[in-house]
């Protein structure tokens, strides 16, 4: 039971929360939206982040032996909430129920069916009106810079001589997301 649930009680975790933790552990850099009936729910730290970001009421999921923070959004309003979260820079893992509840033998099976990030959107309802670039930066003999709009397939790439030219291009294209080469991720002066 990870600390991410921020729960209290002697345990054990109820099966629903065990399933949540198993999926959440596979996508540690994402906010997991976990379908429970007509809602996408978050638990623990994710619930606190969701409630804070969207101004939602933070409640608690309580079972006989365990209590954890909980917040959720109605599935019917998913596009509007997802758009807001993506604009704030969140990466979303969407876990849907993949079998009807009435046909489930025990716990309803859930699987992550979508991974959404600001730069990889293809859903028409979530796309911004302007280009939605995913940028990638690498170093070598200068600065390698590539832009991809996955919704249209547009691709641009260039090699730049200076860091200021790199920043100028980033400012001009305003990417929704930037991927850094490993050596740049560890360079605090760059990030």
Question: What residue ranges belong to the model's regions?
Answer:
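Basic, polar low-complexity surface loops/patches
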Residues: 1-191
């Amino acid at each position: 039971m990870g600390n991410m649930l921020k729960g209290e009680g002697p345990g054990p975790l109820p099966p629903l929360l065990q399933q949540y933790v198993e999926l959440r552990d596979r996508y540690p850099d994402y906010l997991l939206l976990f379908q429970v009936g007509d809602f996408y729910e978050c638990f623990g730290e994710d619930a606190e982040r969701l409630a804070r970001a969207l101004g939602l009421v933070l409640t608690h999921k309580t079972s006989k032996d365990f209590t954890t923070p909980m917040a959720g959004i109605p599935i019917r309003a998913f596009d509007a909430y997802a758009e807001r979260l993506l604009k704030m820079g969140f990466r979303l893992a969407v876990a849907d129920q993949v079998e009807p509840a009435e046909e489930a033998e025990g716990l309803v099976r859930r699987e992550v069916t979508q991974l959404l990030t600001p730069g990889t959107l293809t859903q028409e309802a979530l796309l911004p009106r302007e280009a939605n670039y995913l940028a990638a930066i690498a170093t070598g003999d200068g600065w390698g810079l590539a832009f991809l709009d996955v919704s249209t397939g547009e691709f641009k790439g260039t090699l730049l001589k200076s860091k200021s030219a790199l920043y100028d291009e980033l400012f001009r294209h305003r990417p929704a997301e930037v991927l850094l080469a490993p050596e740049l991720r560890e360079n605090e002066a760059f990030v």
